[in-house]
Design a protein with these regions (language model features):
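Helix-to-loop junctions at the C-terminal end of transmembrane segments
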Residues: 1-13, 242-254, 341-342
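Extracytoplasmic gate region of multi-pass secondary transporters
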Residues: 175-242, 299, 303, 333
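Helix-breaking motifs and short loop linkers at transmembrane-helix boundaries and internal kinks
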Residues: 13, 34-40, 51, 67-68, ...
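C-terminal ends and interior cores of transmembrane alpha-helices
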Residues: 23-36, 265-279
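Cytoplasmic helix-loop-helix junction between adjacent transmembrane helices
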Residues: 44-83
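Conserved MFS/SLC helix-loop-helix module at the cytosolic interface between two early adjacent transmembrane helices
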Residues: 1-39
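Helix-loop-helix hairpin linking two adjacent transmembrane segments in secondary transporters
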Residues: 79-133
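Cytoplasmic membrane-interface "Motif A"-like loop-to-helix N-cap segments
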Residues: 11-22, 249-264
Length: 372
């Protein structure tokens, strides 16, 4: 549902689509609490995915419209960090709700805030700052500075002699923003970002899916002790996303590729470490923390990169292409990791697979151009 949503948002704006998406997946969350059969639950889950799909595209487009170039990666990092914080906070809260009021109330309780937020979004949020009654003239000038001229895209990065060597390495190019749908689907930079994101999301979702079993079967953790340890990648990811967005914006002059490259390289190294990590609770906790940290330092840049390649009108479609690639990786990777585990009986093959994904991601990232 993401690519159709991207086309809709590009034409009609974020206000209605994002509100409808939040309302839709909140309603399906409520319906899960009413399910009486496995088949019914499957159909509800399908509806949940279809209605949830447009939301990331709309949120990324909101950041693109509402933040100046110097803050886009930082804003994206905060948004991504929130998605890392939720898996830390929600599981114990869900257990408490289930133990107190029953499992159905877990779904009812999490649906209600979403329904309220959907209404508030529609009432308060506008597609562009210029359409909002809450934005002052000074704020509007800060957000849109340099974006009203044809040469605006030349200001994507901060040009400085100190970055000369880095700029050669990351292939800084003077590129015109992609302004057509055909241009997006034939852009090596958009498609390359999509493929690299596919590879890195494959690692993240594969880890989140299989880490609990790895801890219990391979490292001998009990189910009680496994909970905190399994959350370490999310804790590291929360810190990494905010830090990575800040570094990309403030320390690297809005360059996106360096943090993307760091994430790919460090993830390969962390997979090697995980292959040889000792049977120690502290070592496993530290290892998983740094896996999440390294993975997420470059995460904001994968989204912010498309903001520099596409223009503001086509970016929702660009975001939908990139996010669809990531979601496909999140769909394929857990199954392939499970297949490898069945065939080899060892988690070493799974970590090798994740390392290969990160290495392929690095190769693709190196081929991308950094828009000047």
């Amino acid at each position: 549902s993401q690519i159709p949503a991207g086309f809709f948002i590009a034409k009609k704006g974020i206000r209605g689509m994002v509100a409808l998406s939040i309302f839709g997946f909140s309603a399906f969350t409520w319906l899960m609490g009413t399910a009486t059969s496995v088949l019914g639950l499957k159909f509800i889950r399908l509806g949940l995915g279809l209605t949830e799909g447009p939301c990331p595209v709309g949120l990324a487009s909101t950041i693109n419209n509402w933040f100046p170039p110097r803050e886009k990666a930082t804003a994206t990092g905060v948004y991504i960090a929130a998605t890392m914080f939720a898996p830390i906070l929600v599981p114990p809260l869900a257990v408490w709700i289930a133990m107190t009021w029953g499992w159905r109330w877990v779904f009812f309780s999490f649906a209600i805030p979403g329904l309220v937020i959907a209404v508030l979004w529609y009432l308060l949020v506008r597609t562009r700052p210029s359409e909002s009654a809450f934005v002052s003239k000074a704020e509007l000038e800060t957000i849109t500075v340099g974006q009203e001229t044809p040469d605006a895209r030349r200001e994507n990065i901060v040009i400085s002699p100190g970055f000369a060597r880095l700029d050669r390495l990351i292939r800084v190019r003077d590129l015109a923003p992609v302004s057509t749908v055909k241009g997006l689907f034939t852009s090596k930079n958009i498609l390359g970002d999509c493929l690299a994101y596919f590879m890195m999301v494959s690692v993240l979702y594969g880890l989140l899916t299989w880490i609990p079993l790895y801890l219990v079967k391979e490292k001998g953790f009990t189910f009680m002790s496994m909970g905190l340890v399994a959350s370490m990648p999310c804790i590291g990811g929360f810190i990494g996303a905010i830090f990575g967005g800040y570094v990309s914006d403030k320390l690297l002059g809005r360059r996106r590729k360096p943090t993307m490259m760091f994430t790919a390289i460090s993830t390969v190294l962390m997979m090697v470490i995980m292959l040889n990590i000792p049977q120690s609770t502290v070592a496993v906790c530290v290892g998983l923390f740094f896996v999440g940290l390294c993975l997420n330092i470059g995460w904001p840049a994968f989204t912010a990169y498309g903001m520099a390649v596409a223009d503001s009108k086509t970016y929702p479609i660009a975001a939908s292409i990139i996010n669809s690639g990531g979601n496909l990786g999140g769909f394929v990777s857990p199954m392939l990791a499970g297949f490898l585990l069945d065939k080899t009986g060892s988690f070493n093959s799974v970590f090798i697979y994740f390392g290969v994904c990160a290495a392929i991601g690095l190769f693709v990232i190196m081929l991308l151009d950094e828009p000047k």
